[in-house]
């Protein structure tokens, strides 16, 4: 049961009834029904009176007064209040919360599982790091974000495909091949000098050694470029897959930019046939990049027709296709595979791609497909108060493997979602190892383990639980938080914001730890009361529900909930 959806539905039905009775002239849509931030304002508030007042051209307080009288008879409602400038606050009957508690324990970890996706196909593309080396910690943030988002969408009924786009074409790959060829010669015993601009990373040595072992001295840089290329990319992609596996991330599909190059002309022709490709001139760009700029006639895509800032070039000065042209081919391929709902995770430095990607998807699909681009910001990592550099070409960068091996997979996955994806994240090694409230995953896992400890230590023979015995403020507060779980799941899924799950689990854990703490000073507040087995049974019923909700939340992270702390 999503109590907020239920009340929202009751309000909508009542508005239709009032319209039929001639009390109001219009119905309201897109009004809010949420728990208030201040507990003194009731269990649920709505702004429906203010939304309706705009259409009715009346004072919101006057409308709120009319609606409050109509909402009071709802079976679920105990009390209705009006607050300036027109909010309606509702206190629900205690039986509502006890009923939700029963439902949680009936559904167990399935409480919060929804079907808003109706098995629609959705493609979630994430990581898609250039295959030039192991994943660094910034890639790890994108990997966790994409993977958990995919899990969240599955939980609400979408048919999700997790995809990795291999950027295996372009100048960076050429540089990589030259770097590996030097390591190959080094493996054969030659002295090498790594010139500026090449990749000096130690991770390339085993690849060079592998080439030497397989081909001996027969490889030549020019003649055997394709052999070196395929071996190198295969080796690095395997390395990336191993790193992602350590993070608990596995993609369903890997798509190669290099293999899609034949689709560029096909996709550009489709746009051209729609009158969306033309030869023209771009205005001089602003900023440093304009210093060497010269005006020239270019092949352009009319992306401004779809809300972009400028039209986009499809060919470079040398006649080769731009990276954007490759993007067009890739998204044409996605649409051809039946994906009309696409999500792409990119680093925040790719913010300029958002409008052009939306433009091309709209153009290729005649507005039938949609794409949502989610940007993740950087991760600041500090070691001995010194920032760790993360440049592949310098050879000195913190890898995802380094972090997972240092703190563990579950900690890494959870911490990566303790901030909204577009906010900078500080990863503090010391804090994530602490067994304290400052360590978010420990705090949540400790709540789950504490719940199971209580259930293990409770008397084996307990009467049937009667939730109506749960009446204290702390007990009801925790039940009300647990009741929010379906709403949290739905909002997080609709907004593509999995960090909301993290925030919610921390809220649940805090409410439980606080409630447990009351028993230190008040023996009657302890969960286990040897002289009151009926109340003990009711409190164990609450503890059981809490454990189900935490386990349900952690399952979205693919994190095993702990029943005991080490």
Curated annotation (Swiss-Prot):
<dbReference type="InterPro" id="IPR005148">
    <property type="entry name" value="Arg-tRNA-synth_N"/>
</dbReference>
<dbReference type="Pfam" id="PF00750">
    <property type="entry name" value="tRNA-synt_1d"/>
</dbReference>
<dbReference type="GO" id="GO:0004814">
    <property type="term" value="F:arginine-tRNA ligase activity"/>
</dbReference>
<keyword id="KW-0547">Nucleotide-binding</keyword>
<protein>
    <recommendedName>
        <fullName>Arginine--tRNA ligase</fullName>
        <ecNumber>6.1.1.19</ecNumber>
    </recommendedName>
</protein>
<keyword id="KW-0030">Aminoacyl-tRNA synthetase</keyword>
<dbReference type="InterPro" id="IPR035684">
    <property type="entry name" value="ArgRS_core"/>
</dbReference>
<comment type="similarity">
    <text>Belongs to the class-I aminoacyl-tRNA synthetase family.</text>
</comment>
<dbReference type="InterPro" id="IPR036695">
    <property type="entry name" value="Arg-tRNA-synth_N_sf"/>
</dbReference>
<dbReference type="GO" id="GO:0005524">
    <property type="term" value="F:ATP binding"/>
</dbReference>
<dbReference type="GO" id="GO:0005737">
    <property type="term" value="C:cytoplasm"/>
</dbReference>
<keyword id="KW-0963">Cytoplasm</keyword>
<dbReference type="InterPro" id="IPR001412">
    <property type="entry name" value="aa-tRNA-synth_I_CS"/>
</dbReference>
<dbReference type="InterPro" id="IPR009080">
    <property type="entry name" value="tRNAsynth_Ia_anticodon-bd"/>
</dbReference>
<keyword id="KW-0436">Ligase</keyword>
<keyword id="KW-0067">ATP-binding</keyword>
<dbReference type="InterPro" id="IPR014729">
    <property type="entry name" value="Rossmann-like_a/b/a_fold"/>
</dbReference>
<dbReference type="GO" id="GO:0006420">
    <property type="term" value="P:arginyl-tRNA aminoacylation"/>
</dbReference>
<keyword id="KW-0648">Protein biosynthesis</keyword>
<comment type="subunit">
    <text>Monomer.</text>
</comment>
<dbReference type="Pfam" id="PF05746">
    <property type="entry name" value="DALR_1"/>
</dbReference>
<dbReference type="Pfam" id="PF03485">
    <property type="entry name" value="Arg_tRNA_synt_N"/>
</dbReference>
<dbReference type="InterPro" id="IPR008909">
    <property type="entry name" value="DALR_anticod-bd"/>
</dbReference>
<feature type="short sequence motif" description="'HIGH' region">
    <location>
        <begin position="129"/>
        <end position="139"/>
    </location>
</feature>
<dbReference type="InterPro" id="IPR001278">
    <property type="entry name" value="Arg-tRNA-ligase"/>
</dbReference>
């Amino acid at each position: 049961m999503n109590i907020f959806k239920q009340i929202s539905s009751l309000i909508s039905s009542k508005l239709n009834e009032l319209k039929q009775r001639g009390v109001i002239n219009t119905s309201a849509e897109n009004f809010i029904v949420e728990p208030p931030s201040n507990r003194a304002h009731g269990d649920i508030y709505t702004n429906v009176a203010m939304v309706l007042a705009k259409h009715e051209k009346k004072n919101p307080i006057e409308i709120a007064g009319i609606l409050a009288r109509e909402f009071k008879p709802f079976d679920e409602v105990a009390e209705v209040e009006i607050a300036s400038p027109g909010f309606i606050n509702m206190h629900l009957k205690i039986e509502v919360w006890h009923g939700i508690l029963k439902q949680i324990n009936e559904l167990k970890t399935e409480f919060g599982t929804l079907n808003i996706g109706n098995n629609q196909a959705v493609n979630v593309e994430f990581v898609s790091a250039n295959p030039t080396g192991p994943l660094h910690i910034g890639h790890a943030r994108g990997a966790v974000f994409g993977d958990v988002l995919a899990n969240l969408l599955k939980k609400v009924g979408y048919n999700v495909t997790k995809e990795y786009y291999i950027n295996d074409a372009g100048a960076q790959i050429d540089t990589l091949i030259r770097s590996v060829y030097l390591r190959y010669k080094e493996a054969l015993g030659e002295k090498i000098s790594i010139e500026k601009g090449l990749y000096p990373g130690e991770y390339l040595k085993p690849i060079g050694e592998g080439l030497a072992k397989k081909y001996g001295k027969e490889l030549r840089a020019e003649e055997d470029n394709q052999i070196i290329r395929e071996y190198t990319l295969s080796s690095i992609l395997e390395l990336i897959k191993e790193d992602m596996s350590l993070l608990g991330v596995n993609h369903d599909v890997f798509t190669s930019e290099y293999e899609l190059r034949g689709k560029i002309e096909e996709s550009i022709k489709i746009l051209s046939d729609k009158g969306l490709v033309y030869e023209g001139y771009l205005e001089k760009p602003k900023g440093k990049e304009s210093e060497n700029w010269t005006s020239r006639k270019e092949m352009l895509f009319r992306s401004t027709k779809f809300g972009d800032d400028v039209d986009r070039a499809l060919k470079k000065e040398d006649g080769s296709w731009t990276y954007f042209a490759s993007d067009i081919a890739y998204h044409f391929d996605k649409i051809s595979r039946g994906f009309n709902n696409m999500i792409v995770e990119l680093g925040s430095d790719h913010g300029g791609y958002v409008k052009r990607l939306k433009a091309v998807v709209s153009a290729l699909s005649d507005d039938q497909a949609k794409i949502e681009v989610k940007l993740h910001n950087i991760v600041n990592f500090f070691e001995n108060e010194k920032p760790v550099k993360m440049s592949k070409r310098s050879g000195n960068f913190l890898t995802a493997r380094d972090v997972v091996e240092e703190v563990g997979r579950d900690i890494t996955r959870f911490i990566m979602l303790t901030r909204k994806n577009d906010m900078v994240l500080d990863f503090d090694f010391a804090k994530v190892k602490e067994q304290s409230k400052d360590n978010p995953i420990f705090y949540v896992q400790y709540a789950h383990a504490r719940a199971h400890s209580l259930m293990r230590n409770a008397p084996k023979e307990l009467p049937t639980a009667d939730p109506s015995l749960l009446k204290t403020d702390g007990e009801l507060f925790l039940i009300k938080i647990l009741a929010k779980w379906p709403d949290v799941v739905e909002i997080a899924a609709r907004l593509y914001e999995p960090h909301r799950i993290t925030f919610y689990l921390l809220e649940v854990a805090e409410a439980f730890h606080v409630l447990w703490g009351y028993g230190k000073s008040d023996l009657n507040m302890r969960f286990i009361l040897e002289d009151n087995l009926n109340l003990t049974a009711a409190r164990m019923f609450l503890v059981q529900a809490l454990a189900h909700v935490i386990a349900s939340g952690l399952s979205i992270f693919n994190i095993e909930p702990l029943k005991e702390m080490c």
